[in-house]
Amino acid sequence: NKTGNKLISKPDSNDSLNFYLILNKTFNYVESKLGIYPINNMVLSKFNQDKDPVYGLNNIPELLNPFDNTFIQEFSVLKLVISSYLNNLYPIHKRKNYWQLKGIEVFLLIDYIEKYYPELNLIGKFSKLSIIKNREYSKFKFNDQYRIFDNIITSRNISQPIDSPIDSLTMINHKVINPYKSGLALKMADDFIGDQNVLKSIYEFSIDNKLISSDKTFIDVFYKNNGEKIAWFINYLKYDNIIDFSVKKIESIQNNHKFLIKNNSGISLPLKITLKDLNNKSETKWINQFKNDTIINVNSKNKIIINPDKYFSEY
């Protein structure tokens, strides 16, 4: 049971107390993003957790798990609370708009880790082992898992468009990849637009559509708030082909460098780039969506990294 933003419980052991603290922390976070949960009871069951698990965390034997049990429980409960909100309160068509359910869920999971565990490594405590700590993969953060899985599937050419109806998705895309791609797409849009725009649109959609019958979708609210600034995003949801950008230095005069960035894809997208100089100092900027080629001039910086956050997989 819960009241306001507090959960009512009577911990009678250390385990119960730990769970109570975890439940309060995760519930209060979700409530801050989605508003008050208007139903008196929220059921968080082992059955629901097993039906929609945290892939990876719930499948590792305890002896080999790089995370402590408290974190695993916290992240699993967080996912259950978000899922309870989204599935119980909103008029989201679960077949047609599956990406909205899972995209919002993954977006909030990413946001939670950024807020509470920004330095958490993907391989947890194993990243400190002497035989591993100098390996490249030991530097991956926990939130890198979403783009790593996406990249693996994209490289095998079995990915599907983000907004595919649920009954058209293959098992791996249904369970893992499309939710991850959806969350990363929202993260990319949030970064591009700025001002926590996606979080604000999620909250607005939540407040306006809780426990009512409505044809309005999250994307309707998102488009209302941003208009043509997210026309590329609507197209990206339906895109079913490779994404491929390339960069080439075409001119260099003293400290002034000219780069040609080619869009070899069939879609116009904004592109995030990181510029670095000889001292490894860097700055990051966005190039507005373009479909073919664009030329940029930069002073002092002599190296460009495209798509540094890997919001989408490239060939």
How would you describe each model-predicted region?
Residues 312-315:
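Glycine/proline-rich low-complexity spacer/linker segments in large multi-domain proteins
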Residues 13-16, 168, 294:
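Coil residues (strongly favoring Ser/Thr
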Residues 42, 230, 243, 250-309:
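Beta-strand-rich binding/interaction modules
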Residues 34-38, 84-89, 108-120, 193-197, ...:
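A generic secondary-structure signal for well-formed alpha-helical elements
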Residues 2-98, 104-112:
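Juxtacatalytic substrate-recognition/specificity segment
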